[in-house]
Regions:
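A charged N-terminal "starter" segment
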Residues: 1-124, 129-131, 165-171, 203-207, ...
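Active-site-proximal loop/turn and secondary-structure-junction residues that shape catalytic pockets
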Residues: 27, 49-51, 73, 93-95, ...
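Conserved, mostly hydrophobic/aromatic
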Residues: 28, 48, 71, 78, ...
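Short beta-strand segments
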Residues: 46, 114, 133-139, 177-179, ...
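Short amphipathic alpha-helical segments
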Residues: 57, 80-81, 124-125, 225, ...
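Solvent-exposed alpha-helices and their adjacent loops that cap or buttress functional pockets
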Residues: 80-82, 104, 126-129, 145, ...
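Active-site loop/helix belt of alpha/beta enzymes
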Residues: 140-276, 366-368, 377
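Charged (often Lys/Glu-rich) extended helix/loop segments that serve as interaction or gating elements
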Residues: 250-416
Length: 416
């Protein structure tokens, strides 16, 4: 990828016809280092959030060695770009072919499940292997999240103890996991879920080797200002100390959004202005799926090739709706988005914080979807991991020192 200091430098230096994804590798590396330095256990990157090759390469270079995968294509990607990495197949429902290939072709030994039928598939397709790590996914409350993931996966509490006992009989190592929901705004949600998991483990009357607190770690978006990330880690650490598990039990987490949300933005061109409607060359079927369908708020800013300093237009702003390039009327993003009132055809809008699920959900519907990737070095929006832009303007970003000693539990000798 070609590197520009800022997206505005790109806009001023060349014609921009198709959407341009602005990658920020430093933001991925910074987030990866933060989790490795602060989370008191194993950190798995949830590949679903952004499976781009450049993201995997940066994470691997930054020290990430454990990946949460959901399909054979994701497994193949990780195997290609991160050759020494461990993988956990944490999709609770997998095809028999996927289980078999993951185990025999790629050496995957960690599998999630939330029912006995899935457990039987795993056992049958691995020929009742004795080296399996089985992770039982529990259903927990998603009340603390802005985007609930409850309802599709997770064994309900009234069945959980039996499921944990059954899995224990077939597992070399046994774990429990849960997901508190996407963009969790309450650190206490992890504590509640962990203590519920502890209760179910005690009810099952067996030992577990792994507690996986899943994902849900938040990012900063317009109107969404979560607590500092270290408050989430503190809540998890404190709850882990209270859990009724062995001293040598491992603690895992699966950040996706938190690792990559700051990593990408898209430059999209205004093709038509019609009242308060802006027609763009990217939209709901491209990298703005969440903006359209989940009504997710993303930051925007205008770039003009010929304008005043910093590419700014008039100080007066107006509220706009956005429409994507396809012929589908559902390709609409109601917003409202505050942009300069004199915005015009040919102007470039940068839509930020698209690193999580922007690329992953993009399609080529109607023949649209082709994009160019470039790297940029700026950090225009608030970050969970580094100093705010107004604190670091025109200087190198300064890392906020939040690292604490990693209080890992003593590692005792594993069961034979």
């Amino acid at each position: 990828m070609h590197t520009y200091h800022t997206p505005l430098d790109l806009v001023r230096s060349r014609h921009v016809e198709s959407p341009v994804v602005c990658a920020r590798p430093d933001r991925v590396a910074q987030a990866s280092h933060w989790f490795q330095d602060n989370f008191p256990g194993e950190v798995l990157y949830a590949v679903k959030a952004n499976p781009s090759a450049w993201v995997l390469d940066v994470l691997y270079k930054a020290g990430t060695r454990f990946f949460d995968v959901a399909s054979i294509p994701e497994i193949q990607l990780v195997a290609e770009h991160c050759p020494a990495a461990r993988m956990a197949f944490l999709h609770p429902v997998k095809s028999r072919e996927s289980i078999r290939r993951a185990y025999y072709e790629f050496g995957v030994r960690i599998f999630a499940l939330d029912c006995e039928a899935e457990l039987n598939k795993i056992l049958e397709e691995t020929n009742h292997a004795r080296d399996l790590t089985l992770i039982v996914r529990l259903a927990v409350s998603n009340d603390g999240a802005l985007f609930s993931l409850a309802g599709k996966f997770g064994v309900p509490a009234y069945e959980a103890a039996d499921m944990i006992r059954t899995a224990r009989a077939h597992a070399d190592e046994l774990g429990v996991s849960f997901h508190v929901g996407s963009q969790c705004m309450q650190p206490s949600a992890y504590r509640s879920a962990m203590l519920e998991a502890s209760r179910l483990i005690a009810q099952a009357g067996v030992t577990v080797d792994i507690v996986d607190v899943g994902g849900g770690f938040p990012s900063i978006y317009p109107g969404m200002n979560p607590p500092p990330m270290d408050e989430y880690i503190s809540a998890i650490e404190d709850a882990f100390e209270e859990m009724m598990v062995l001293e040598n039990a491992d603690l895992w987490c699966e950040p996706g959004r938190a690792l990559v949300s700051e990593a990408e933005s898209v430059l999209t061109r205004v093709e038509l202005v019609k009242g308060d409607a802006l027609y763009l060359n990217d939209g709901a079927y491209g990298r703005l799926f969440d903006a359209a369908h989940a009504k997710w708020p993303f930051p925007v800013r205008l770039h003009r090739r010929h304008s005043t300093a910093n590419g700014k237009a008039s100080a007066e702003t107006a509220s706009f709706r956005l429409f994507g390039p396809t012929c589908d009327s559902l390709d609409a993003i109601p917003g409202p988005f505050e942009l300069p009132a004199d915005i015009a055809e040919g102007d470039i809008i940068e839509i930020g914080m698209l690193g999580a699920y922007g690329t992953a959900l993009a399609t080529n519907f109607n023949g649209f979807g082709s994009v160019e990737y470039v790297a940029v070095e700026d950090m225009p929006w608030p970050s969970m991991f580094v100093a705010q832009p107004d604190q670091a303007e025109d200087t190198d970003a300064t890392v906020i020192s939040l690292a604490r000693a990693r209080r890992r539990r003593p590692k005792l000798r594993r069961r034979a």
